[in-house]
Amino acid sequence: MTGIGDLFRSIAIYREWTFGGRTKARAPQPTDLPADFLLPDASNLALVLHELVQRSATRKKLIDYLKRFYAAAEQIATRIHGGTVQLFIDEGMDDFVPATRLSDGTLRYLSLLAILCHPTPPPIVCIEEPELGLHPDVLPTIAELLKDASLRTQLVVTTHSDALVSALSDIPEAIVVCEPSPDGTQLRRLDRESLAEWLDRYSLGEIWRMGEIGGTRW
């Protein structure tokens, strides 16, 4: 049973994405928290990003993706003082924006970067609705991050976003449709060949909205 317990403990699950004004992700964080991977409540976000930016390749990747969302960002910065670490975005010219002033969406995006750009993630990572709080035009970037991270870990992602699904039109087989039935929830993986003619004319999200792949409310 120890092996099974260790396996379950190695699964990273992100279900509650709350980044309001009093959340731990905004506040200075104790330096004795784990720094290897993001905790479910993102309470060690500053510590994880502090570790990741020490690696040149990962730092470049983080900044490149951050600039797609936050054009003014030059660097991800952290300050360690009095046993705590605080997160900032460096906009250049000594203009450091603390996590306490960042939008909910920016903190959510930084958390996704901390998860999806990590070079050595846990073996299984589960993320519920990564699109929440983000502008639809950034969802293709989220899809790109998901594809990249899936090369290093098994990702399980839930979504209600047709924009995010559309951004995965090139890999329809990655989508599993969940539907209720009298016998319980049914899971069905999409098949590229059966959708080929549809995908010649429409994105996967459009096909979903048309009701052609299931996963609808009716």
What is the predicted function of each stretch?
Residues 1-109, 113-120, 213-215:
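Phosphate-coordinating catalytic segments in nucleotide- and nucleic-acid-processing enzymes
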Residues 128-129:
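Walker B catalytic acidic pair
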Residues 132-136, 140:
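Conserved D-loop-proximal element of ABC-family nucleotide-binding domains
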Residues 141-218:
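C-terminal lobe/lid and adjacent interdomain/linker elements of RecA-like ASCE P-loop ATPase modules
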Residues 105-108, 135, 190:
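Gly/Ser/Thr-rich active-site loops/lids in small-molecule metabolic enzymes
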